[in-house]
Amino acid sequence: MKKLEDLILTYKDFPKKGIEFKDVLEILQYPDIFQDIILKMSSNQFLKKAEAIISIDARGFIFGSAVALESSKPMIVARKPGKLPGQLLTREYDLEYGKNSLSIQVNALKKFNSFVIVDDLLATGGTVKSVSRLIRDQKKKILGLITVVELKSLKGKSKLDFPVHSIVTL
């Protein structure tokens, strides 16, 4: 049986020179491993206390949807520019390789007060921090982050002021 760490592929110089991109999509080709990851993510203690999940564009949707289904929690999406209709909350953030922004629909947040963020990977923490600020600006709570992979060398966890649970740390 394959090990999870073996399914996280590295692409050098992607999306630009000097970046080592960690790709989790290989996991989806192994349903038994994917299911095990989802069960582990769904059994997290701070998820049990959350009213809803927020997943981050785009690979976060894969894991967030499955965790939402397994845990019977509603899911809200944080999307990149130009992808959501309606009234939006938007925040810019820094990446290892540039800047971007994320938006969440205002109406989606009105229904809930406490959230867990689900994403595929924690690197520098910029994306997750951006989402957490969007939520907190609305006087809502972030109970934690659940992610498949944490890249320890990039120290993203140290930039967050809420619990982080990663299935694997590289």
Swiss-Prot record:
NCBIfam families according to UniProt: PRK02304.1-5
Glycosyltransferase among keywords: yes
Annotated metabolic or biological route of this protein: Purine metabolism; AMP biosynthesis via salvage pathway; AMP from adenine: step 1/1
Tagged with keyword Transmembrane: no
Similarity comment text for this entry: Belongs to the purine/pyrimidine phosphoribosyltransferase family.
Signal peptide positions on this chain: none
Any one Gene Ontology cellular component term annotated for this protein: cytoplasm
Top-level taxon: Bacteria
Main location as per UniProt: cytoplasm
General function of this protein: Catalyzes a salvage reaction resulting in the formation of AMP, that is energically less costly than de novo synthesis.
Alphabetized UniProt keyword annotations: Cytoplasm, Glycosyltransferase, Purine salvage, Transferase
GO biological process terms on file: adenine salvage; AMP salvage; purine ribonucleoside salvage
Pfam families listed in its UniProt record: Pribosyltran (PF00156)
Sequence intervals crossing the membrane: none
Listed HAMAP family: Aden_phosphoribosyltr (MF_00004)
Subunit (UniProt): Homodimer.
InterPro entries found in the cross-reference section: Ade_phspho_trans, PRibTrfase_dom, PRTase-like, UPRTase/APRTase
Species per Swiss-Prot/TrEMBL record: Prochlorococcus marinus (strain AS9601)
Molecular-function GO terms, alphabetical: adenine binding; adenine phosphoribosyltransferase activity; AMP binding
Record localization: Cytoplasm
Protein name, entry field: Adenine phosphoribosyltransferase
EC number from the UniProt entry: 2.4.2.7
Catalytic activity from the UniProt record: AMP + diphosphate = 5-phospho-alpha-D-ribose 1-diphosphate + adenine
CDD domains, per database record: PRTases_typeI
